[in-house]
Amino acid sequence: MKAKRIVFKVGTSSLTNADGSLSRAKVKEITRQLALLHEAGHELILVSSGAIAAGFSSLGFKKRPTKVADKQASAAVGQGLLLEEYTTNLLLKQIISAQILLTQDDFADKRRYKNAHQALSVLLNRGAIPIINENDTVAIEELKVGDNDTLSAQVAAMVQADLLVLLTDVDGLYTANPSTNPDARRLEKIEKISSELIDMAGGAGTSNGTGGMLTKIKAATLATMSGVPVYICSSLKSDALLEAAEESKDGSLFLAQEKGLKTQKQWLAFYAKSQGEIYVDQGAADALRNNGKSLLVSGLVSVLGSFAYQDTVTVYEDGSGAILGKGRVRFGKSSLKDMLKSNKPKGVVIHRDDWISLTPELNDLFAEF
């Protein structure tokens, strides 16, 4: 099998006992399979939940806490204990692991994004296995990624992985809930993530974690748009990681877009915060939507918000109000207003290289980014 750069995401339900505590046996089994893949030449990243599960009992909690402060304290204790389990097991196989804790700001801030990418690249090139989790102890709501499905997709896109594997307690995406509907059918291959597919995914996860199938669809959307295929499978089957690396037929495979978004386009689509709104006429909307053109001053109808040079704005079609996309402007709001007063306004407001087209469905799906 060809060596791949693979990002594995392991959820809380795949790491815990029935009482919600960390299962050392499950961690050991995961590291055994990681070691075999590492020895086969694969570059591996593990995005692992489980910090709260590993730490809450040490603080005297009888069960997994629900209050934010209690969960953050449990994560602070558990993160070290969880990493110790991974590190000890991997060292027995002469494999170095590294801990990286991230927040949403590490993706939204271009400088920090670059630093994280460089650190991961060095670790992979040196044969280490980075073990990543969200920094639950310090992350405030505005900086939270929210779930490790999304975090793993962000990491996979960042490092341009060959495959993202989401390990869970179900063996893929079904047409209905397989536990309640005997006619539910597993989808083995998904070529396009449609709005119907998103609706079908619904919500609902397990009590020990935060992610349901809908978060996995969101993660798959982000990754496949960035050129990374996604495989959802069950961690409960033996050799689940080994089989997932070969994309066996025991899960659901989401095919990557042929032309995945480059780093700049990823940042615009998923992380750049919009500072204003621009409304354009139908001609400009058609040029942006269908012809791959830049946005010219002559196509502007109105500008709203407070934005400066190089800020990101959202562009809509005037009249219909339909979202067209986001881009980085070459003029601030005041300059654009002055230019619009001219009889023949000229200039490029957003160059095509600084533009990403968005559908309403995609905009809604990633609204919290």
UniProtKB/Swiss-Prot annotation:
Which domain of life does this protein belong to? Bacteria
Q: Where in the cell is it found?
A: Cytoplasm
Major subcellular site = cytoplasm
Which reaction does this chain catalyze?
L-glutamate + ATP = L-glutamyl 5-phosphate + ADP
Binding residue positions for substrate: S49, D136, N148
- Domain PUA positions: 275-355
Primary enzyme class: transferase
Identify its protein family.
Belongs to the glutamate 5-kinase family.
Q: What does this protein do?
A: Catalyzes the transfer of a phosphate group to glutamate to form L-glutamate 5-phosphate.
Give the NCBIfam families listed for this entry. proB (TIGR01027)
Q: Mind telling me what this protein is named? A: Glutamate 5-kinase
